[in-house]
Amino acid sequence: MIIYATEVETINSFVRLESLKELYSLVWIFVPIFSLVLGIITGVLVIAWIERELSAGIQQRIGPEYAGPLGILQALADGTKLLFKEDLRPSRGNTPLFSIGPSIAVISILLSYSVIPFSNHLVLADLNIGIFLWIAISSIAPIGLLMSGYGSNNKYSFLGGLRAAAQSISYEIPLTLCVLSISLLSNSLSTVDIVEAQSKYGFWGWNLWRQPIGFIIFLISSLAECERLPFDLPEAEEELIAGYQTEYSGIKFGLFYVASYINLLISSLFVTILYLGGWNISIPYISIPYISILELFERDPIFGTTIGIFITLAKTYLFLFISIATRWTLPRLRMDQLLNLGWKFLLPISLGNLLLTTSFQLFSL
């Protein structure tokens, strides 16, 4: 009986160990996801504060200064206010479409972060088709905006949703052609491989210098995809009140507010990855032992990951500065001007750039 009891206790201890292993594995699956979500929320708060301060400086006025030191908690206060506001719904609208629209817009943008490498050791999913996965997922967001506009049963909202769909289609094609040019130069669709291909040649190996035309087209197309001035036709205040957001209030309106900043952040991150070398730390005219730094990254992954995150975010916020300054300095385009720019100028130029890149790659074989 004593031996039998001992065997039972041993079996129970093994069962407990196996259950603990399964629990730990589940925890470690969700830890990077929650860390990424926390980082995104922090990034959105920082972007909102930078835009308020920068816009105040451009317009020569005082920005937020009461909520926290230098008004750094103003965005958090605005989000808290929207969280506790009443969630109104149009009485004659399509309630399912009206409710699902904001969620589709936010989730489709959040999923794009899964293929963004902050260093060669920090990426949720290093896929062979990572860059195309981002394009495919980002094309779902306009469907949510169109659903929101149609479900609101409001002519301003519906027109805003139609404008969002038309604008997305017009600028998604030039953006995709620019991505194809980068993929041809890197011989890969993986975001990690694209950054490593640029890192081989240091600063002058960045795709910014190898694809200057594609960089300008990608920059304009990404601003149009984010629906920022001068491309904010779907929510033009003077024409459509707030576009597809007209009937929204409370947390649903806050989701659109957050989605716009998340989309701006992810566009800036992809500009950094595709054209600015990602976590590449080479600086021109300054002698940096790049090989020794790579060896240090391999020896100490934690240090390499920390430095990679810092460099990637530094380049990203530099592009964010350009995007915010563009919003507060340029006037809004008309709808016909926006479509003409996309179809008559950016599309032919991006197609020509792709043909030139293809020819160069063929002759270099």
Swiss-Prot record:
Q: Does the keyword Thylakoid apply?
A: yes
Described purpose of this protein according to its UniProt entry: NDH shuttles electrons from NAD(P)H:plastoquinone, via FMN and iron-sulfur (Fe-S) centers, to quinones in the photosynthetic chain and possibly in a chloroplast respiratory chain. The immediate electron acceptor for the enzyme in this species is believed to be plastoquinone. Couples the redox reaction to proton translocation, and thus conserves the redox energy in a proton gradient.
| InterPro entries with a match to the protein in the record | NADH_UbQ_OxRdtase_su1/FPO (IPR001694), NADH_UbQ_OxRdtase_su1_CS (IPR018086)
Provide this UniProt record's keywords sorted from A to Z: Chloroplast, Membrane, NAD, NADP, Plastid, Plastoquinone, Quinone, Thylakoid, Translocase, Transmembrane, Transmembrane helix
Q: Name one GO molecular function term.
A: quinone binding
Q: Name one GO cellular component term.
A: chloroplast thylakoid membrane
Of which family is this protein a member?
Belongs to the complex I subunit 1 family.
Q: Does the keyword NADP apply?
A: yes
* Enzyme Commission identifier(s): 7.1.1.-
| Organism of origin | Arabis hirsuta
**What is the recorded membrane topology of this protein?**
Multi-pass membrane protein
Where is the chain membrane-spanning?
27-47, 98-118, 129-149, 165-185, 203-223, 253-273, 302-322, 345-365
What is the official name of this protein in its record?
NAD(P)H-quinone oxidoreductase subunit 1, chloroplastic
**EC class of this enzyme?**
translocase
- Compartment(s): Plastid, Chloroplast thylakoid membrane
What is a single Pfam family found in this protein's UniProt entry?
NADHdh
Q: Which reaction does it catalyse?
A: a plastoquinone + NADH + (n+1) H(+)(in) = a plastoquinol + NAD(+) + n H(+)(out); a plastoquinone + NADPH + (n+1) H(+)(in) = a plastoquinol + NADP(+) + n H(+)(out)
- The source's domain of life comes to Eukaryota
